[in-house]
Amino acid sequence: MNPSITLADVQAAAHRLSGHVLETPCVESRTLGRIVGARVFLKFENLQFTASFKERGALNKLARLAESGAPVGGVIAASAGNHAQGLAHHARRLGLRAVIVMPEHAPTVKVERTRSFGAQVILHGQTFDEAHAHALRTAAEWRPEVVLLDI
């Protein structure tokens, strides 16, 4: 957890996301609560368009870029799957080019879903770290049109 994140930061993010992602239900799990001896709540982020909470972080990052006023022609990121889909979906919705670098052995379903959301997918490296390093190199070559998003 980043200790420099304030309540105001969380409230600003909630405002940015409002109307663009689903307000998913939060339900108490009595079974898990009994196991751990505390109240446990489950947030059903699987109901999001991309079926993942990662969509929230991707959209918040894109919205913050838009707020900055800096010209952004596209975004590039490294991801093994869920972040890629959220970024691709919201970049397309905002009219931005999205390039996602994924490890060569990323699950086919994640690669294809990312492409279906309009992103260009580059498969590179055996590990996430290798894909991330390639994304950094690619971003350095494409600047200033592409901004690296690293979540």
Where do the protein language model's features map onto the residues?
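PLP-dependent amino-acid enzyme catalytic core
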Residues: 1-151
